């Protein structure tokens, strides 16, 4: 299911003295089946943008097309419930939204709310908890007895149980240790590959954006600043830094090595493995250049 923004603008508290423009002139598409990352400095419009992906917010100008559904400025949209089943959103710290007595009831809440029978919802809960790498035995336990990482996986299972076509992730690894972050990101990538899920990731982690995303959208002051593959986007390193966007650690090391040893590494290096390989290649070719004094 493709999602397209056409000249989208969003203003909070529209037509009041407190009106504030959060998005403007946003033109971007997320074709079905892809893995995308949205990056940008705090306040660049990322969170406002993703709330348009399933109608939580509606544009004050322009149109958002979600599959065959058009959400346009000035039109009161009704029956958005089916849309929110197709586009599942995992907000920051989703475990804070857990509330039921058992893990099973929490995961079943979404499917039941969409009219699924109790028996079918329980089956979806069993499938979803295995998708997020947890044992079915946890279904009978209180979610509040689990570890923080387990609680987050339960909350994600609740979204997956609704079988969305698009999975939107807003800083999904925030607050987790490095091991937990890596496990969760690998889980999302596996779901993307095995289930054909379209994934839209909002992140401040440039390593994750570079590693997983096929296309990266850079937001700045409410509009799209850059869009392209990781190689294309991070080739604009100086411009990104000027607008407050961090760079992958490998690019920072690349610069430091070039300056320290007076060598030129022409290829973009988006992981430490790539950087190591490129440094070895340059040195084998006698890539040392005399440092200017």
From Swiss-Prot:
One of its GO terms (cellular component) is ATP-binding cassette (ABC) transporter complex. This is Energy-coupling factor transporter ATP-binding protein EcfA2. Belongs to the ABC transporter superfamily. Energy-coupling factor EcfA family. ATP-binding (A) component of a common energy-coupling factor (ECF) ABC-transporter complex. Unlike classic ABC transporters this ECF transporter provides the energy necessary to transport a number of different substrates. ATP binds at residues 40-47. InterPro entries: AAA+_ATPase, ABC_transporter-like_ATP-bd, ABC_transporter-like_CS, ABC_transpr_CbiO/EcfA_su, ECF_ABC_transporter_ATP-bd, EcfA2, P-loop_NTPase. It is found in: Cell membrane. PROSITE patterns: ABC_TRANSPORTER_1, ABC_TRANSPORTER_2, CBIO. It comes from the Bacteria. It is a peripheral membrane protein. PANTHER family: ENERGY-COUPLING FACTOR TRANSPORTER ATP-BINDING PROTEIN ECFA2, HEAVY METAL TRANSPORTER. Its main location: membrane. Keywords: ATP-binding, Cell membrane, Membrane, Nucleotide-binding, Translocase, Transport. Residues 3-246 form the ABC transporter domain.
């Amino acid at each position: 299911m493709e999602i397209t923004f056409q000249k989208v603008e969003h203003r909070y508290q529209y037509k009041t003295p407190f009106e504030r423009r959060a998005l403007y002139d946003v033109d971007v598409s997320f074709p079905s089946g892809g893995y995308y990352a949205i990056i940008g400095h705090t306040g660049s419009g990322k969170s406002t943008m993703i709330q348009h992906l399933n109608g939580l917010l509606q544009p004050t100008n322009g149109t958002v097309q979600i599959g065959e559904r058009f959400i346009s400025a000035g039109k009161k949209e009704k029956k958005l419930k089916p849309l929110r089943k197709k586009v599942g959103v995992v907000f920051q710290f989703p475990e804070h939204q857990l509330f039921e007595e058992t893990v099973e009831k929490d995961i079943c809440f979404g499917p039941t709310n969409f009219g699924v029978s109790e028996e079918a919802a329980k089956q979806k809960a069993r499938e979803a908890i295995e998708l997020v790498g947890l044992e079915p035995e946890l279904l009978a336990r209180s979610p509040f007895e689990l570890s923080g990482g387990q609680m987050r996986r339960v909350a994600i299972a609740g979204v997956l149980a609704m079988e969305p076509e698009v999975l939107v992730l807003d800083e999904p690894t925030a607050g987790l240790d490095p091991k937990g972050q890596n496990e969760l990101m690998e889980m999302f990538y596996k779901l993307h590959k095995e289930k054909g899920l379209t994934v839209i990731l909002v992140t401040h982690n440039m390593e994750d954006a570079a590693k997983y995303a096929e296309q990266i959208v850079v937001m700045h002051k409410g509009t799209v600043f850059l869009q392209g593959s990781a190689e294309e986007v991070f080739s604009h390193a100086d411009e990104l830094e000027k607008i407050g966007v961090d760079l992958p650690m490998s690019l920072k090391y690349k610069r430091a090595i070039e300056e320290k040893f007076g060598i030129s590494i022409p290829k973009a290096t988006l992981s430490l493995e790539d950087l190591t390989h490129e440094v070895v290649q340059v040195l084998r070719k006698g890539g040392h250049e005399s440092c200017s004094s």
